[in-house]
Amino acid sequence: MRHVPLSIYYKVGHAVDCNRDKMFRKLFLITLLVFATFASATAQKKEMAQAKAAIKAGKAAEAEASMRTLLANPDNRSNEKIWLVLFDAVKKQYEDVNEQMYLKQSTDTAKLFEAAYRMFGVLEGLDSVDAQPNENGRVQLKYRRKNAEYLDAYRKNLYTGGSFFLNKQNYQRAFTLFSAYIDCAKQPLFQSYDYTTKDKRLPSAAFYALYSGYRTNDPVATLRYKDLAEADTARLQLTLQYVADTYRAQGDTIAYVSTLEKGFDKNPVSEYFFPHLFDYRFQRGDTTQALTLCNRSLAINAKSKVAMLAKSAVLLTMQHYDKCVQLCDAIIALDDSLADAYLNAGLAYFNQAVKIDNAPKHTRAERAKMLEFYRNSLKYMQTYRKLAPTRKDLWAMPLYTIYLNLNMGKEFVEMDAIIKSL
């Protein structure tokens, strides 16, 4: 018989012992895991039982907080029972406030709308759990139909709540509730209701959400529902104005100008879109486009003083001086308190005089024409000074030059002192 070294027996025995230890450790860990799971489940049941008792005892807010603490643990979010207890807690708070209002007792109306908002959040969260496929990969919805039917009856409270907070100038909460109202249209929970095509209040809710975002200087909130808000034709001008202001604040020039153009196309005589789009074109030296804007606006309202003044500025820049003066006189005939009409007419004459004055040589006839231009400019510039006394930067130098050329010594001395003080 072959002799086997004792070392071999030792190694085999040692290996068996090691395997046994590993097996025991695995069994211990499995037992510990099962115990921990059991303990966790037991603790959950206890908390849910306590929450149900709290709801009955009139402590629904405490029950809600307890269930939300459980759901904060990702491992618990798939537990439908926690969601259901949470909903009962929120629902009870809504019913309590509603009862107080019905009985005309003193209560905080905001709590009613806040509870309604939370009810939607809870059942939408439950629906996401309900929609998960089972172990066979199939989705079996147990709650959707019932919960959607229940919430549909309360959905109007989200809109009303948004309006409530809007009137209270609580624009952040107003946005939150209007946003929840709108987003129901995208929630799988309400798929069968087809709010997108059937709910005629969605555009107005979108406008109010946009306005709320605008009032809180939140560009993301302002622009979130802008496309839907544009379907609210009664408030389209305001929608485009708030959107344009938001793009301008963000420095998005392309979107800003595009929105101005859209607004101007809808209403060429708008007191917002015409001036802003005109300023953009004119300040960049695009006089042709600026003039086109003026003519389009005047084609609808020939006596628009804003468009007439804007056009006179373009004509002055384009050196169409006779047309500029003619238009300024028409403006003054409509309203003799508009200072810029006098300024533009005065500069139209003044510029022509300076052009002759700056020439190396000029004939006697040219000099006479120059003085005539200065005299014509004078009456407009003096009136402009009276109407805009603080705009010394615009009237001081022209009047200084006019007084000098017309030998008006006393007036020249006064203007010289004013210029030196600037």
Residue ranges and their predicted role:
Residues R77-N79, P188, R235-L236, S270, ...:
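Residue-level recognition of tetratricopeptide repeat
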